[in-house]
């Protein structure tokens, strides 16, 4: 019981610590795409390695990355591979983005469609607010 209390207390303090991130893949507002289809947005970064490991072909991955293809058209393909990777460390980042930034507890077609209208536009203010929320100091 005491260990539980100590853990929660320590964890809450650790969450408040600022982070210095010297290895980032965020492009910044001047280089980011302004219109982003939600599946294409959510699979950016290392999660694509998991998709490839799960057997997605490059052609299928190109479909998921295509901003011009509507979410509903690519959902079946995404869902097929998401089920294979959803518990990997990289997919955890995707789940955290959905939960912490967009308020969605699950990844489903309905939740992704709701996110479509909430995709954060790449402005300086939006980028800075994400860093503040994560306690990452931008220098």
Place the predicted regions along the sequence by residue.
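Metal-cofactor-binding active-site regions of metalloenzymes
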Residues: 2-139
């Amino acid at each position: 019981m005491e260990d539980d209390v100590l853990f929660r207390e320590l964890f809450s303090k650790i969450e408040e610590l600022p982070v210095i991130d010297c290895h980032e893949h965020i492009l910044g507002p001047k280089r980011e795409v302004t219109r982003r289809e939600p599946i294409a947005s959510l699979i950016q970064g290392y999660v694509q390695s998991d998709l490839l490991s799960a057997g997605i072909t490059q052609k299928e991955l190109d479909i998921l990355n295509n901003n011009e293809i509507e979410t509903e058209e690519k959902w079946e393909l995404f869902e097929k591979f998401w089920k294979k990777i959803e518990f990997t460390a990289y997919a955890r980042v995707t789940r955290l983005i959905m939960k912490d930034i967009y308020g969605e507890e699950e990844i489903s077609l309905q939740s992704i469609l709701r996110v479509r209208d909430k995709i954060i536009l790449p402005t300086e203010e939006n980028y800075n607010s994400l860093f503040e929320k994560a306690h990452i100091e931008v220098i």
